[in-house]
UniProtKB/Swiss-Prot annotation:
Residues 349-366 have a biased composition (Low complexity). This is Probable glucan endo-1,3-beta-glucosidase btgC. The chain crosses the membrane at residues 318-338. The keyword Glycoprotein applies. The gene is btgC. It comes from the Eukaryota. Residues 1-53, 117-140, 175-258, 286-314, 346-372 are annotated as: Disordered. GO terms for molecular function: glucan endo-1,3-beta-D-glucosidase activity. The active site is at 498 (proton donor), 597 (nucleophile).
């Protein structure tokens, strides 16, 4: 989509941040979408109080890549990439870096369209810097500088999308049944303006500014109930399975609550989303695309949606359709409840054929035993010549680790073992998003059973507005680390994923709370003589000097796809954005810098920085196998050669995220290198980098 091109220049401020000024040039294309990479500024002047984080992000008019820059303030909107839910059932083939992310590069919930801009000052500059990109320079280590393209709109001209963690479901299907309890907490990461929230978006809103996380799947219905009036004050649960607070901006743009309960429930998630619009009246003129944080583990993490309100002339037809869909929903819920115990991602021709598709987690173990490296099924999975260990890290969230659903339908240890058997052929470094449902313990057990001596784990702690959830997560982290026989298997602990992004205009308060949690973890480790890096991950533009000071590692989510970046420029843009917004913040320190999420969808349409509003189907960032191959070709081996540290998002598709798809944006469930059954996608080629492997 064309639009005025903006040139930005930085003016160094006393606080170490850069201030951007810009000029509009009507002759150049502008990429106006929000990416999971964008983040929000703490400066109140850059953000409307009703917006959940969309703010202008200063960016300079770069002449070359990789050159030292002054720190860039983080004035972004929320995104979350990144995943962790297994609505498909405990026995589901665990190949899914479920959840948050896409969040994916910057984040976590994604949002586009009119809703993405709601609450902003109306200026195109109020967008994440990661969304746009400038012409490439000769300093880029990935690809030769291309000819002048006339200047692409900087990321500032892009609308932010919410990002997702790998544990976050991008679609309604991400929300498992049973997680209805609204979250509420006294201590939260920032308080958003609840008075401006639409009750349809979040009937039971959290007190905090952070939308629900990957662990919180929002659903309007439980596996046993149809829509009913619920008094959140009467619910005894801690609420981490409740609705994520939805703001009028990204977070508020939720579709109707939909929750697939089992493998067969993924499709039902889409139906639920449609029905929500019939059972509830809502005013938005356009449908917004934005997963709720908390529908998956990192879209927790994430999943309320908004459907257009039926016009008066179509009300009767709407009720008829609603009645029909209600019948389907009831069947889906009933089937989901049953499927929750049998959901299995297995496919007939997958290597895990020994596991019946109707098995529960315990049934899988009863039939196959506790899988290990000597199991025939595991040997087959670990002998895939098309997989190469060229990724420094992989974002991963096992299926079925959404609390409290996992209490009723426990995740499958064997599925985690199967996943790890595959992941071990891609990387020696796995990143988790949370500690609920024994997911960390299952990963450690799988590593032991498979004898993966080189495999390391980045522990994840999900932080959100619900203090009970955060407390449970942190306490479990302590238990895991304190009970570990050898902590050398841990590369570090990531406290929070895109917590600042989800805080919206309350980023300052959220950062204070986040750093408090980080310091608490640091103090605990010190007290127990545990030497382990402490970090947090957020949109690339959300990092600032204060956050860098308390973190041992700067971890940023960066997604070129949501910036509408053509794939032949994506690798260069990603590296440059990371260098100019994150790496530069660590100059003069010994802090490491890591891209915590980066990837490309294998299908579903194209994004021109403004969602699917492209003039044709070849403009902007195009999702596809060829494009995914191109991005890996330009990024993977070069990153391996120059030592760029990153986590790929992601290894496995997450089918439940289909609910987040729209008519022209059908990529939410297609970020994996493999399908849910752990089979490499047709035509996809993972670079072998001449035999070189990641450490």
């Amino acid at each position: 989509m064309s639009g005025p091109h903006r040139t930005f220049s930085f003016e160094q401020r006393g606080d170490g941040e850069a201030h951007s000024s810009f000029m509009d040039h009507a002759m150049h294309p502008q990429y106006d979408d929000v990416s999971p990479i964008s983040n929000m500024s703490s400066s109140p002047g850059h953000m409307n109080e009703t917006h959940h984080g969309l703010a202008s992000v200063p960016e300079d008019n770069h002449q070359g890549w990789g050159q030292a820059r002054g720190p860039s303030p983080s004035n972004r909107t929320g995104f979350t990439a990144t995943p962790e839910m297994d609505n498909l059932g405990p026995a589901s083939v665990g190949g899914g870096i479920s959840g948050i992310a896409l969040g994916v590069a910057n984040s976590h919930d994604r949002l586009s369209g009119v809703e993405a801009r709601r609450g902003t000052d109306g200026q195109e500059a109020n967008i994440p810097a990661e969304r746009g990109y400038n012409t490439t320079g000769s300093d880029n280590p990935y690809i030769p500088a291309p000819p002048d393209m006339g200047g692409y709109g900087s990321s500032e001209t892009l609308h932010p999308r919410q990002s997702y963690g790998s544990n976050v479901a991008l679609g309604a299907a991400a929300g498992p049944a049973g997680q209805l309890t609204p979250g509420h907490s006294a201590t939260h990461l920032g308080t958003s303006n609840s008075s401006q929230r639409n009750l349809y978006d979040a009937p039971y809103q959290s007190a905090g500014g952070l939308s629900a996380g990957p662990y919180q799947r929002h659903s309007a219905y439980s596996s046993n109930d149809l829509p009913l009036d619920i008094n959140p004050e009467e619910i005894a649960d801690d609420g981490d399975d409740g609705f994520a607070p939805a703001g009028n901006s990204r977070s508020s743009a939720r579709r109707s609550q939909a929750v697939p309960a089992a493998a067969g429930g993924a499709a039902a998630g889409g139906v639920l989303g449609g029905i929500g619009g019939l059972f509830n009246n809502r005013n938005p003129a356009e449908t917004s695309y934005d997963p709720v944080p908390g529908a998956g583990l990192e879209a927790g993490e994430k999943s309320q949606w908004v459907k257009p309100k039926p016009s008066t002339g179509s009300r009767k037809r709407g009720w008829i359709i609603g009645a029909i869909l209600a019948v389907i929903i009831i069947g889906a819920i009933v089937g989901g409840a049953v499927g929750g115990t049998i959901g299995h991602k297995d496919s007939g021709d997958s290597a895990s054929g020994s596991s019946a598709s109707t098995q529960s987690a315990s049934g899988d173990t009863d039939t196959n035993g506790d899988l290990d490296k000597n199991s025939a099924e595991i040997k087959a999975l670990m002998n895939n010549k098309d997989l190469h260990k060229v990724f420094p890290g992989m974002d991963y969230t096992p299926w079925g680790v959404q609390y409290p659903l996992c209490l009723k339908y426990p995740p499958s240890q064997n599925n985690v073992t199967r996943d790890m058997a595959v992941l071990a052929q891609l990387t020696n470094n796995v990143r988790l998003y949370g500690t609920d449902c024994n997911q960390t313990e299952m990963v450690l057990h799988a590593i032991d059973k498979l004898d993966l001596k080189d495999m390391k784990v980045w522990l994840g702690v999900w932080i959100d507005t619900n203090e009970t959830t955060s407390r449970r997560q942190i306490d479990q982290l302590y238990k895991i680390v304190d009970d570990a026989k050898d902590i050398s298997i841990f590369n570090g602990a990531i406290v929070g994923n895109e917590a600042l992004f989800r805080a919206g205009d309350n980023k300052i308060t959220a950062q204070a709370t986040l750093t408090k949690y980080m310091q608490e973890v640091r103090d605990h480790f010190k007290k127990h003589d545990i030497k382990m890096p402490i970090a947090t991950s957020d949109l690339g533009d959300n990092w600032n000097a204060e956050l860098v000071q308390i973190a041992d590692v700067v971890m940023s989510n960066v997604h070129p796809f949501f910036g509408g970046i053509p794939v032949d420029q994506a690798a260069a843009w990603t590296w440059r954005f990371w260098q100019d917004h994150d790496v530069i913040l660590t100059q003069g320190t010994d802090k490491r810098q890591v891209i915590s999420e980066v990837g490309w969808p294998s299908g579903g349409g194209n994004d021109c920085g403004k969602g699917a509003n492209c003039p044709d189907d070849t403009s902007g960032a195009v999702a596809g196998i060829d494009e995914l191959n191109k991005f890996m070709e330009d990024w993977v081996c070069q990153a391996l050669d120059n030592g760029t540290d990153y986590f790929w998002f992601e290894a496995f598709d997450e089918p439940w995220k289909i609910e987040f798809n729209t008519k022209n944006e059908n990529w939410e469930d297609k970020w994996g290198l493999m399908d849910p059954a752990r089979k490499l996608k047709s035509g996809l080629k993972i670079p072998d980098c001449g035999g070189k492997t990641a450490a």
